[in-house]
Amino acid sequence: MKTIGLVVKTDPEAARNADELEKWLAGRGVGVVRTGSVSDDRKAPVDLGCVFVLGGDGTFLSAARWIGDAPIPLVGIKFGGVGFLSETVEDDLFSAAEKILKGEFTIAKRMRLRVTIYENGQEQARRTVLNDVVINKGALARLAHIHTFVDGYDLTTYHGDGLIVSTPTGSTAYSLAAGGPVIHPAVPGIILTPICPFTLTNRPLVVPDSVRIELRLAQSPSDIMVTLDGQEGFEMTEGHRLMIEKAAHPVHMIILPGQRYFDVLKTKLKWGGGPAGY
């Protein structure tokens, strides 16, 4: 690898480690492109060999925005709170870097969603998300009424605080906190998780990743927002329509030797070991 990207959380410890990593890479003849802030109008150079993400899940999602559709592998180094998307921790940063430079890793492809927002029939925005699309109401707003179609079929109207549409990767984020299922990243599905539904029969639903989901507001109380990966938000009214489907380009995540998804899951969710009583 001739050049590596660095996306660094705004944190003194993460910044210090990033400085050390830059020097370490320079000593091995590897150039570095470093950023701490990400915007949609500034993308990563397409010739990066990979991107190290020093931070938490929010920083990782920012890095996924930074690379856009380019198949640049990402590796997360945990410096944040949760770290479901992190491959390793701060103490193993340089051993991970050594393995990556030697090519001792595999790639896991994580599905993304393409979100197109229409306002009065005109396209307002088009984005891709790795985790989720969230429609929710403000603290003082009335119930959100979200009319939901799957491949043109009138599925239901969700009445409640909102709705989360997530990828399997995003199933361990907001969707999990709202009562949604944990879905393995290799499962080709999309999860619809209502937030505090007023109708008790509105339960989380997993649909194939081949479907196209359309969301509209059946009624339009004020203060309804659409949030994309927790990074960007849009106001939503009755004049808006959301189209959500599987994106053409997945995110490529670096998997180091000996790392398994279930190890991360078990650690983060604090699951126990053997059967009760043993």
UniProtKB/Swiss-Prot annotation:
It catalyses: NAD(+) + ATP = ADP + NADP(+) + H(+). The active site is at residue 57. Pfam families: NAD_kinase, NAD_kinase_C. GO terms for cellular component: cytoplasm. It is found in: Cytoplasm. Its EC number is 2.7.1.23. Involved in the regulation of the intracellular balance of NAD and NADP, and is a key enzyme in the biosynthesis of NADP. Catalyzes specifically the phosphorylation on 2'-hydroxyl of the adenosine moiety of NAD to yield NADP. This is NAD kinase. The gene is nadK.
